[in-house]
Amino acid sequence: MKIITWNCCLNLSKKFEEINRLNPDILIIQECEELPEDFFPNARYYWTGHTKNKGIGVVLFNNTAKVDESFNDKLDYFLPLNLDNGTKLLATWSFTHRAAGRFGEGHIGHVSEAIKYYKNWLEGSDKAIISGDFNNSVIWDKGNKDSNFGNTNAVLESMGFKSCYHKLNNEDFGTEECATLYHTKKRDKTYHIDYVFLKGLNPKSIEIGSYDDWIKLSDHVPVIVEI
């Protein structure tokens, strides 16, 4: 099974052909628009967002799913899906608390809060995936705040989740050789902030898209995991 996460930087409908060439089974897309069901004739599309042109979507090519009844639209943007094979998927597009505040009172956008909220649900299955644009790295950690990525990763590890990239490449968080974000599309402004965390599933390989192949489409490159 191939899992791909990618922040497409808007207009998925114009970029879908490119990402679809990678033949995903599960495609997690951030910053994408709401699309009609018939746009994906051979797949199922699940989406949530505040505006129709900017949200988080999941395209399933060989599975169906149901949005879990615990779904909380005040958590921006996190989509909990129960796949028909028993796997749980939390599609993720995380924001800082300050950025999430723009969505309105009571809205929370940080992944640390989403993990707290969905913890019982995630622990209800032996197999689970948390994947997407986390907008975070240990390089920005200060003090001992819950929102620090080091603390977030510690919570995930306590729940049995492992980052595919770090497991397969034997690299420490914050020292990643491969970037997933090229800020302002500059080749030298690199960050690793997109992740695939797995529990009860064994990754066979991981690939990070190249700057040259993807920079015309987005400031992010795809993260591609085979399990």
Positions of predicted regions on the chain:
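N-terminal, active-site-proximal structural segment of metallo-dependent hydrolase catalytic domains
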Residues: 1-41, 50-56
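Active-site metal-binding loops of divalent metal-dependent hydrolases
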Residues: 8, 32, 94, 133-134, ...
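Active-site environment of divalent metal-dependent phosphoester hydrolases
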Residues: 10-15, 33-37, 97-100, 137-139, ...
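Metal-dependent phosphoesterases centered on the DNase I-like endonuclease/exonuclease/phosphatase
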Residues: 26, 108-193
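Structured beta-strand-rich core segments of catalytic domains in phosphoester-bond hydrolases
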Residues: 30-99
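Conserved beta strand-loop-helix elements of the APE1-like EEP
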Residues: 51-67, 84, 182-204
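Active-site-proximal loop/helix segment associated with metal-binding centers of metalloenzymes
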Residues: 89-109, 146, 154
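Surface polyanion/phosphate-binding segment centered on an Asp-His-Pro turn
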Residues: 216-227
